[in-house]
Structures are given as structure tokens and as C-alpha cells.
Design a protein with these regions (language model features):
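Catalytic-core regions built around general acid/base machinery
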Residues: 19, 76-80, 102
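Short glycine-rich anion-binding loops that position phosphate/pyrophosphate groups of nucleotides
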Residues: 7, 63-66, 91-94
Length: 142
């Protein structure tokens, strides 16, 4: 996960950290925080970070993106057969057009609008849930 800015809300940061630790125990997971700024400078920093991950499948979080069920997300990630995946979360004003153009898919968590901190916590939870679905963990209930 590449995200803009540091989390200021301690409760959300703690939840995100908990899911990050769980994901790290399941395999290779990294949360990269980039400095915030205007959308274009954030976009430049994101593209620089992505240059190091040219083999990854890129999901950009954007309100115009497609929503997925948790099961569908788990299936999609499983179908990548171990290929690295990067989820990009922009700052308070979203992602630059250049970042969206670089993405393999635009992904929306919901038609609702969330703060970027809530969105970060939600994507960490959904990634953990996707792993739980694939491993048959009791965390996910149908």
C-alpha cells in the first residue's frame, strides 16, 4: 500500500497498524507513507515509488473506480498468482490524473465518501479479509 500523509487519528492508525501486522505475518506486506502536498506533487512522489515496482499490478483508489465485494477482491488478488500488488491511496484531494492513468485498475471502496485515513484503514482491513477468505480463516463469515 502506498499512501499519502501520516495518520493523525490514533484510533484509526492503531487499527491500520494491527491489520498491517497481521498481513505481514501472512506474507509480504508493506505500507509506504509519502509526504503530502498538492495533488500534482503527491502524484510525482507516487509515480517515483511505483517506478521501483514495475512488475506490480496497480490499483488506484478513486471515487470513480469500480466497487468490488470482499469475495471478488479476494478472487482477483488470488488470480494474480503471487504477482506483486500495489494499492495507492491519495491524500485529501485524491490522485493526480497521471497516477490514475498509470494504474491497472481504479478501485472504489464504496459510493460513500471517506476521509483518506478511514479509507486507508478500510483497505488494510479488506486486504486482510481477502487473505482470510483465501486461507479459510474464521475472520470472514459468509
Amino acid at each position: 500500500v502506498i499512501a499519502i500523509g501520516k495518520m493523525k487519528n490514533r484510533s484509526l492508525a492503531k487499527l491500520c497498524d494491527d491489520f498491517s501486522k497481521r498481513l505481514k505475518r501472512q506474507g509480504n506486506f508493506e505500507l509506504i507513507e509519502l509526504k503530502d502536498g498538492d495533488v500534482e506533487s503527491e502524484g510525482h512522489r507516487i509515480l517515483e515509488a511505483l517506478a521501483k515496482r514495475s512488475d506490480a499490478s496497480i490499483y488506484a483508489m478513486a471515487e470513480e473506480g469500480m466497487t468490488r465485494t470482499s469475495q471478488r477482491l479476494a478472487d482477483e488478488l488470488h488470480s494474480l498468482q503471487g504477482r506483486p500488488v500495489v494499492f495507492i491511496l491519495g491524500g485529501a484531494y485524491g490522485l493526480s490524473d497521471a497516477v490514475k492513468a498509470r494504474a491497472d485498475a481504479l478501485f472504489a471502496l464504496s459510493p460513500l465518501t471517506f476521509t483518506h485515513e478511514i479509507a486507508r484503514m478500510l483497505i488494510c482491513e479488506q486486504l486482510y479479509r481477502a487473505v482470510a477468505i483465501q486461507t479459510g480463516s474464521k475472520y470472514h463469515h459468509e
